[in-house]
Amino acid sequence: MDEMFDKLQAVADRYDELNELISDPEVIADTQRFMALSKEEGELRETVDKYHQYQDVTQQIADDDEMLHDKLDADMESMIKDELKELTAQKAALEEDIKVLLLPKDPNDDKNIIMEIHGAAGGDEASLFAADLFSMYSKYAERQGWQIEVVDENATEVGGFKEIVMMITGNKVYSKLKYENGAHRVQRVPVTESAGRVHTSTATVGVMPEEEDVDIDIDPKDIRTDVYRSSGAGGQHINKTSSAVRMTHLPTGIVVAMQDERSQQQNRAKAMQILRARVYDYYKQQEESAYNAERKSAVGTGDRSERIRTYNYPQNRVTDHRIGLTLNKLDRIMNGELDDIIDALIVSDQAAKLEDLKNNG
C-alpha cells in the first residue's frame, strides 16, 4: 500500500505542476506543447480526484475515531458508528478504484482503429453474418459519436460480405473495440433453409490500432507495389488509367489492394495506411504469442481464430465465452447496444491485471 501511495503522491505532484504550466503564457503561446500538457493533465485528473476523495474519507474516519474516545450519549455514539461503517466501505471502494487507475495504460487505447470483418465458415450465411456484424458495429459507433469510413469491401450476391474493412475514428475507439478480435459464431435458421434447421456459421473480426506515426520501420525495399485498372459496376466512376494499387509486404506476405479512391496517389496513401496497421498487428501478435502461451488473459489472446462469442438467434441469446457472460437480448445487441458486454470485458481484464500485479509484484 505504501508503494501505491508513493505513486499517488507523485501523480498528484505532477498534476499540480501541469496546472501551473498550462497557465504559463509562454506555454499557452506554444500550441503544440500546450495541447500535449493539457492532454496529460486530463489523463491524470480522475486519479487525482479519487486520491483527494480518499484523503478526505481517511481524515473523516480519523476524526470519528477520535470522537468515539469522548463521552457521548448512546444516540450520538450509534450515529458515529454508522457513519464509520459507511466511510470504511467508501475507503475500500476508493482503494479499488485507485488501483485500477494506476494500472499501466495500453499505449494504443486512445487510437482510432482499422476493423476487418471476414465471412468465414458457412458460405453465404457467413457472409450475411459478416454484414450483420458490420451493421452492429456501425450502430455502436454511432451511439459513441464515432465516425466510420468503409475503405474496402468484397460483397456477395446475397447481400453479405466476404470481407469489409473500415476505419473507425473518435474518442478512445481502440480501448473499447480491442476486445472484439476473434471468431464470432452465429446459430440461426438461414433464410434459404426450408426445413427450419438451425445452422452454425462464423465470421472473424480483426481490430488494429491506426498507425500513422507508428514506431515501426517499414523499409521501402520490402514493399512491392503493383498498379492496375480499377473495376466498377455500371454507372460508377471507372478509371481508364491504372489507379488501383496492390501493395505486398514481402517479409510477412501481407497484401493490401485499394481501388476505392479516384486517383492512384489516394489509393497508395490509403493502402499504405492499412498495410502499416496490418504489419504492426502481425509483429505485435508474434511478440505476444509467447506470453499468451504462458497465461491467456481474461479476454483471450486476441487471436482471430479463437472463438470469443456466440449469437444464438432462436433463443435471443449472446454468450461471451471468455468471461462466461450470457445476455438474453440479442436483438438489442445487434442494434448496437454493446456496452454491457464491453464494460464486463474491461472489468474482467482489469481484475486479471490486478491479480497479475499482486502475484508478480
Swiss-Prot record:
The keyword Protein biosynthesis applies. It holds the Pfam family PCRF. This is Peptide chain release factor 1. InterPro entries: PCRF (IPR005139), Pep_chain_release_fac_I (IPR000352), Pep_chain_release_fac_I_sf (IPR045853), Prokaryotic/Mito_RF (IPR050057), RF-1 (IPR004373). The modification N5-methylglutamine is found at residue 236. Keywords: Cytoplasm, Methylation, Protein biosynthesis. The keyword Cytoplasm applies. It is found in: Cytoplasm. Methylated by PrmC. Methylation increases the termination efficiency of RF1. One of its GO terms (molecular function) is translation release factor activity, codon specific. Disulfide bonds: none annotated. One of its GO terms (cellular component) is cytoplasm. SMART domains: PCRF (SM00937). It comes from Levilactobacillus brevis (strain ATCC 367 / BCRC 12310 / CIP 105137 / JCM 1170 / LMG 11437 / NCIMB 947 / NCTC 947). Peptide chain release factor 1 directs the termination of translation in response to the peptide chain termination codons UAG and UAA. Belongs to the prokaryotic/mitochondrial release factor family. The gene is prfA. Gene3D superfamilies: 3.30.160.20, 3.30.70.1660, 6.10.140.1950.
